[in-house]
Amino acid sequence: MQKEIVKTKKMVFGASCIASLKDGKTVFVPYSLPDEVLEISIVKEHKNYTEGKIEKILEVSPHRVEPRCPHFYVCGGCNLQTADDEYQHFLRKSMALEALDRALSLNKEKAVFEKQALEKSFFEKSIFVSGPDWDYRARFQFYIDKDGSLSLKENKSSGSVKIKDCPIAVPAIRNLLKSNLKEYTPNSRIHIFSDGEKIFTQDNAKDCEVRLAGKRIKFNPLGFFQSNLEMTEKLINTIFEYAEISSSVLDFYSGVGTFSLFAYDQAKEIHLVEHNKHALAYAQENFLINSSSSGIVREKKENGFPKIFYHALDGKNWAKTKESKLKFDTVFVDPPRIGIDKEALSWLCSSGTRQIFYISCDPVTFARDTASLLVSGYKLEKHFLFDFYPQTHHIETLGIFRKN
């Protein structure tokens, strides 16, 4: 097996550091940190790069620590526990901003990027919002082994690894893992969510319910909901600190209405677009339970309560509807990891919407879509990075775009 001594450079999105081999080829080394000298073995060759494995650390980064989790190197969940928490913040911010810089620099012929996005101070202007580094994750999908044990997906494998503890899980889920309870059906999967006290699964609860920023939000245990509740609340509070809502609001990829729910007191009209009919039904219920309780202040405005419209369709088909011709002063867009649908992005760029709040779980697709928005005349006024997923390379981005 080929071995070489290399010095790592920067960390790239995915949490591997890059280094150069003797022949000039780039090698990606997982579990390494920047500026370490390593003896590595080459484990996989590609046309333009290689993958390496650490055999020995010859010069150790001052930021390297022992992983807290005993399953770290086999579990497919975390990949940054080798760095201290503060340095992780720096690494995640660096990786996210590099993805943005790289995507925008591909459009060098468009001077708009130099003016709006590639200024030297952009790194300092981007706001990093942190929360708990451990005991934060409230949602898991576990595999049930043949003996009834809870397992998580094994790293780079179709297999699974039995989990006796998970230090990033909220205490209620950690206690469940430590109890070694084996009451679940072998050779199956189970979705588990905790509000910090209760454990919700598809077996013991039809609905999950949490309270965020004073609102009650219900969703299905099998459906999507954010896994870091404290950071979700910080995200919501930040959005509505900057939102200037006076008329019509569009909630794109709305899910259960998490963001538009908080626009109720200011908007005259709210449109939710979501392809998942089950999630949209929960959105309707969330507006109902909050408007009929103290969750939403129902002081009658001059123009009455806002009208709420639910559109069960995907982003690709939104532009074909008559409602897409309406003028919205605010759009919330929270797409899946693949980013905004091409057709939806085209509509958004030409919509004339005054302010767009783009929430993204992937800095790469956020950067790609940002390029299109900037070309169409929007300015990236604020850029936030919310540390939703400590101990991993993942991060949540909020971009606030405005057009005069």
From Swiss-Prot:
Positions binding S-adenosyl-L-methionine in this chain are 226, 253, 274, 334
InterPro entries named in the record:
MeTrfase_TrmA_AS (IPR030390), NA-bd_OB-fold (IPR012340), SAM-dependent_MTases_sf (IPR029063), U5_MeTrfase_fam (IPR010280)
Keyword check for Iron-sulfur, yes or no.
yes
Which parts pass through the membrane? none
The UniProt entry, under PROSITE patterns, shows: SAM_MT_RNA_M5U, TRMA_1
**Keyword set includes NAD:** no
State the source organism's domain of life.
Answer: Bacteria
Q: Where is [4Fe-4S] cluster annotated to bind?
A: 69, 75, 78, 166
- Catalytic residues as annotated in Swiss-Prot or TrEMBL: 361
Entry keywords, A to Z: 4Fe-4S, Iron, Iron-sulfur, Metal-binding, Methyltransferase, S-adenosyl-L-methionine, Transferase
In the record, the note on similarity to other proteins reads: Belongs to the class I-like SAM-binding methyltransferase superfamily. RNA M5U methyltransferase family.
Q: What is this protein called?
A: Uncharacterized RNA methyltransferase TDE_2619
What is the taxonomic lineage of the source species? Bacteria, Pseudomonadati, Spirochaetota, Spirochaetia, Spirochaetales
